[in-house]
Amino acid sequence: MGDNCKIQNGAKIYEPAKLGDGVFIGPGVILTNDQYPRAVNSDLNLKLSTDWVQSGVNVGAGASVGAGSVCIAPVNIGNWALIGAGSVVTRDVLEFELVVGNPAKHAGWVGHEGLKLARISDQSFQCPKSKRIYSLIDGELKYGGAN
């Protein structure tokens, strides 16, 4: 777990999850670690800890996972991404991407402030609070740091 993370009540974070610096995990969030959960093997004998391979959820720096969301391992959540409350994440989430729903789908882009960005041109977005400009390059949002 990185520095300055905030983990809210009732969150369940299973190893080998990794949290970057400044991550927010909302109340009741679940980060899973078993891609193919079963109580028994094909012979109906109880699975042992050696009978499965853990896979984790990796949450990038500054990202937020909203209340009651479930992230199904293995997934990577990019830096500064925002997962809307109650979402079920089954795929990787890009940096600054906003996803919502079940399954979680692209719903826009957010900036460092966590606010949805306003489109100001075909490939540019602006934060309504900080006025920072972000650019869409090859399907990924980038911040140039010029503001």
Across the structure, where does each feature detected by a protein language model lie?
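Structural signal for interior beta-strand "rungs" in well-ordered beta-sheet cores
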Residues: 1-42, 46-106
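Intrinsically disordered, low-complexity terminal tails/loops enriched in metal-binding residues
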Residues: 61, 123-124
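Short, intrinsically disordered, charge-biased short linear motifs at domain edges
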Residues: 95-101, 110-119
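Cys/His-enriched microdomains
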Residues: 106-109, 125
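Short cysteine-rich clusters marking metal-coordination/redox-active sites
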Residues: 111, 127-130
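Short, non-ligating residues that shape and space the ligands of small metal-coordination modules
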Residues: 119-121, 133-137
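Hydrophobic residues embedded in beta-strands of well-ordered beta-sheets
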Residues: 124-125, 140-142
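Glycine-rich phosphate/pyrophosphate-binding loop
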Residues: 144-147
